[in-house]
């Protein structure tokens, strides 16, 4: 069976992990109702965490649906993502989007993040 799980090592688990990304976010990707913050890590694989507050997503059922969709989207795209720590933040109005729209939007956000990280790594690599 292929490695399609979502192991603990791919999650931001501690408050320190979150603080590190919030304090030193190198990349921001905006979408309708979502914001992705990311920072390179030295682990060799991407990790993700979520911030879906009651203020922005009122009902628990909607917060859980969003977490499930983002987690699944990340799981399917993680093999393409560079080694970064990612935080996905919900903004107001995201709970009004349907699942298909969210899935398309997340796919585009992962691609933009991948492109931005590649662009920065190429720019920071000195030429011979």
UniProtKB/Swiss-Prot annotation:
**InterPro entries, per this entry?**
Ribosomal_Su5_D2-typ_SF, Ribsml_uS5_D2-typ_fold_subgr, RNase_P, RNase_P_CS
Q: Which reaction does it catalyse?
A: Endonucleolytic cleavage of RNA, removing 5'-extranucleotides from tRNA precursor
Q: What is its EC number?
A: 3.1.26.5
An annotated Gene Ontology molecular function: tRNA binding
Q: Name one GO biological process term.
A: tRNA 5'-leader removal
Q: What are the record keywords, sorted?
A: Endonuclease, Hydrolase, Nuclease, RNA-binding, tRNA processing
In terms of PANTHER family, this protein maps to:
RIBONUCLEASE P PROTEIN COMPONENT
Q: What does this protein do?
A: RNaseP catalyzes the removal of the 5'-leader sequence from pre-tRNA to produce the mature 5'-terminus. It can also cleave other RNA substrates such as 4.5S RNA. The protein component plays an auxiliary but essential role in vivo by binding to the 5'-leader sequence and broadening the substrate specificity of the ribozyme.
Give the protein name, as stated in the record: Ribonuclease P protein component
């Amino acid at each position: 069976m292929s490695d399609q799980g979502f192991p603990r090592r791919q999650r931001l688990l501690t408050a320190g992990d979150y603080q590190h990304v919030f304090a030193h976010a190198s990349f921001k990707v905006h979408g309708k109702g979502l914001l992705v913050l990311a920072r390179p890590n030295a682990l060799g694989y991407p990790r993700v965490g979520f911030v879906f507050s009651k203020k922005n997503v009122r009902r628990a059922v909607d917060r859980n649906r969003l977490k499930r969709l983002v987690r699944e989207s990340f799981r399917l795209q993680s093999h393409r993502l560079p080694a970064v720590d990612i935080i996905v933040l919900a903004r107001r109005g995201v709970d009004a989007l349907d699942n298909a729209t969210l899935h398309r939007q997340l796919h585009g956000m992962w691609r933009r993040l991948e492109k931005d990280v590649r662009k920065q790594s190429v720019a920071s690599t000195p030429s011979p």
